[in-house]
Structure formats: structure tokens, C-alpha cells
Regions:
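Conserved catalytic core of two-metal-ion nucleotidyltransferases
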Residues: 2-37
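Right-hand nucleic-acid polymerase module
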Residues: 23-168
């Protein structure tokens, strides 16, 4: 480790970055939840995504900041993330290792119900359940957006993506 200029730190019982226990028991790490063979997302990160989706619909409802077209683009970005300057951003990109597809279908259903409540054509909305596969495909265009149509900077967009993730 010295050759790599890395320092080995003592294991701290009260540390929030390390823990020990039986590997057969559920545990959480970096926003993920591991339980048997299921890799999911920690509950706080799921709730944060729901809250951010609701926030987006509320801003649209109150006609704050964007048109219907921009709302749909922003919602799709929230669902799929995107590639900016060759780097993948977004909730689904961060949690691309999950195999909890039930969670993704529940999120899709929540978005569908919200679209119905706000008179948004759900056919125009991308799906969490598809994005998980598309994020792993280097040739996909599912994550391609014309970001110049948005009234925000790339930097602000990246910060919005980080706001969706609760990994601490």
C-alpha cells in the first residue's frame, strides 16, 4: 500500500464508513441495500427520488420555470440520467448495479399515476425499467438529449442529478 501512497486506517467501531457483521444479514453501503442476492437502493435514496419527482410535478403545476415540453424533458432526465461530456450522470446511472426490478416498476407506476393526475401523456415519458438496461449499452440513444433546449446550465443539471442520490 505504501507504493500506492495509501494509508491503512484502523477499523473504527463508531465509523460510518465501515462496519462488520454476518454477510448473510442485510446491509447498506454507498446508498445500496444488499439482502441475500437482491441488490437494491437504500430506502432514503428511494424516498429522495419520489420527493424529487413530486417536486418536479409541483413546479410544473405551479407554472414555475418551464413549459410542458421542458417539463417532459426534465422528467425524462430525472428518470434516465444522461451523458454530459462523455460522463454518465443520474440516479439510474449511480444505481446501475441493482437487480431489484420491482423497485423500478414501482417508480414507473408512480410516474404514470402522476402523469395521469397532471394530464401529461405518459407515452412521452421514459421508463426506469428500461433505463437500467440502456445505461449499460454504449450504443444507446435513450440517454441522448438536446440540452441546449433547457433553460439551465450543464453545471446546474449535474447538481440536480446529485440531489437525487443519498449515498451517505
Amino acid at each position: 500500500f505504501e507504493d500506492l501512497k495509501l494509508t491503512i486506517h484502523d477499523f473504527g467501531i463508531n465509523s460510518n464508513k465501515s462496519s462488520f457483521g454476518n454477510i448473510n444479514e442485510p446491509f447498506e453501503f454507498l446508498g445500496y441495500k444488499f439482502e441475500d442476492k437482491l441488490i437494491s437502493v437504500r430506502e432514503t435514496s428511494i424516498q429522495k427520488m419520489y420527493a424529487n419527482i413530486i417536486k418536479l410535478f409541483t413546479l410544473y403545476k405551479n407554472k414555475k420555470y418551464f413549459s410542458k415540453e421542458e417539463f417532459i424533458t426534465r422528467l425524462n432526465l430525472k428518470i434516465t440520467g444522461c451523458v454530459i461530456d462523455g460522463k454518465k450522470y443520474g440516479w439510474i446511472s449511480f444505481f446501475s448495479l441493482i437487480n431489484d426490478y420491482t423497485l423500478l416498476f414501482m417508480l414507473d407506476k408512480f410516474v404514470e399515476k402522476s402523469c395521469k393526475n397532471f394530464n401529461i401523456n405518459y407515452e412521452e415519458i421514459k421508463k426506469f425499467s428500461r433505463a437500467i438496461y440502456e445505461i449499460k449499452d454504449p450504443n444507446t440513444n435513450y440517454l441522448t438529449y438536446d440540452l441546449s433546449t433547457l433553460k439551465t446550465s450543464k453545471t446546474k443539471l449535474v447538481y440536480d442529478f446529485y440531489d437525487d442520490i443519498d449515498f451517505y
